[in-house]
Amino acid sequence: MFQDNPLLAQLKQQLHSQTPRAEGVVKATEKGFGFLEVDAQKSYFIPPPQMKKVMHGDRIIAVIHSEKDRESAEPEELVEPFLTRFVGKVQGKNDRLSIVPDHPLLKDAIPCRAARGVDHQFKEGDWAVAEMRRHPLKGDRSFYAELTQFITFGDDHFVPWWVTLARHNLEREAPNGVATEMLDEGLVRQDLTALNFVTIDSASTEDMDDALYAEALPDGKLQLTVAIADPTAWIAEGSKLDNVAKIRAFTNYLPGFNIPMLPRELSDDLCSLRAFEVRPALACRMTIAADGTIEDDIEFFAATIESKAKLVYDEVSDWLENSGNWQPENDAIAEQIRLLAQICQRRGEWRHNHALVFKDRPDYRFILGEKGEVLDIVAEPRRIANRIVEEAMIAANICAARVLRDKIGFGIYNVHMGFDPANADALAALLKTHGLHVDAQEVLTLEGFCKLRRELDAQPSGFLDSRIRRFQSFAEISTQPGPHFGLGLEAYATWTSPIRKYGDMINHRLLKAAIKGETASRPQDETTVQMTERRRLNRMAERDVGDWLYARFLKDKAGTDTRFAAEIIDISRGGMRVRLVDNGAVAFIPAPFLHAVRDELVCSQENGTVQIKGETVYKVTDVIDVTIAEVRMETRSIIARPVA
């Protein structure tokens, strides 16, 4: 009687359209229930039985039910699943496999089986890549996944590296391939093998891509020649090796080892500017005035060089600071170091006065044993030798930016536009509350940005600087010349690391076209998109491996009285994030550890402060003493507690 009844169908349709619905993202909790977060202000409770249909992070549409003034969400439609491809740990029970995703908020095992063509016999503890195949909101009875790749066994000491690389879908090994002979590029190479070029790197560096030679001119000016390794002399554009480098975009530097962009035969040997080996190079000669200005007589040319010394940062720094036992091999090398230090001094002063200089932050180096165990983590401050190389490279990149802009019209540029114009008024208002008066329009210009940065650098603490960071735009890779506000420069194009950056290889080819007086074709936008994406993935991989190693390193300090100095780097509603000064580890301090009475505590991300009973007790950039309360290995998170 009711079958195909149009009135009944209409009533159903009406009920459906009148039932309130909301779209949002599922947030799971450790208690079994969850929330549908619609926006920053509004969320709906999802009861435990309904949570079985969804996963943390799923974007869904849900029906909203109201009972006794309480609203709850019933998941109805999947908009976008949180999990598609993921990594996890396999569990095996009675020949039935399941996989637990490697994610802090995903605890449930998902039934799975190996995909066709994967011949590994999976067992308990194995790490694998999986892809979701079924979801309850797609009409399936349950969640289900397929194992598409075996990563490694559970007892492999190098799990942090292999799992992280698989998670971000990055290569594990150096590319294959070899270059047998140099290309005929129609370039005349200047023979500079007699000059005393030197390289300055870490003791363990094999891929040396820059060598320096300095000369004092009679008029008190200094001449600097920067010679850069020349992989494009071996790798033809569009060749198999070139395409591999284009995809990888960068050498991936992880704690303990790197995965090069080019085959090791090239990166660590044929192209590496090894001491006493004759190598092709692309070179730039510039004149530096007494005040550090780079004069207009910039010259780029192809060359052949022979490095006369592989110098090490710490040894050179010690020698310049009159400490340690190391001595340069001969007077010629000593003279080079002295002249390079003078150039560094001049360029540093010029950048301080006319551009911007980054604050020195130490690099943290993991010292690992043969089984990947963390023996120590050392802070390596940026010393004079590091600054010598940095100033030479920045000067060379400024030269390339000018030459490419004037002779070619494009290149691979690092562009940073400073503050987002949409944030200018809010920025000016915030600065005003702290006694700094800026014009909202002026601060959007390079000059205005530099002026503000110098004022911020003169502040007694970095607190205000940390507050305005959220108003800044991101640096971009662009084919169009543009300013780099972060460096305080009108244009910046890197070409000094072609062994490890594909963008620098592109700039080499464009600079060679300029040397020969030829025209060149503009790099495609897809190339800059790929480079930006790879840079993001490599940084995430470095962070993920680091988090894992920090957790391993600090595990035995959990629950002890060992104190660590820690800088507050972020404050949120739930607590504070701090960075341990001695080793760089990031830890979280939950709000209850700051003050027991929740109503008396205000943690404000907006203001970067923690207030207790209305009084500011902590703020971002403060350095406090903490102990390690807990290390959770499964999520690689470190929980700290302030020392009372």
Curated annotation (Swiss-Prot):
Record-annotated membrane-spanning stretches: none
GO-annotated molecular function: exoribonuclease II activity; RNA binding
SUPFAM superfamilies: Nucleic acid-binding proteins
Keywords annotated in UniProt: Cytoplasm, Exonuclease, Hydrolase, Nuclease, RNA-binding
Cross-referenced Pfam families: OB_RNB, RNB, S1
Catalytic reactions of this protein: Exonucleolytic cleavage in the 3'- to 5'-direction to yield nucleoside 5'-phosphates
Location of this chain's protein in the cell: Cytoplasm
Example GO BP: mRNA catabolic process
Cellular component GO terms held in the UniProt record: cytosol
Annotated ranges, domain RNB: 189-516
Source superkingdom: Bacteria
PROSITE patterns from the UniProt entry: RIBONUCLEASE_II
Enzyme class: hydrolase
Residue stretches making up the S1 motif domain: 561-643
Main function: Involved in mRNA degradation. Hydrolyzes single-stranded polyribonucleotides processively in the 3' to 5' direction.
Entry's family note: Belongs to the RNR ribonuclease family. RNase II subfamily.
Protein name as catalogued: Exoribonuclease 2
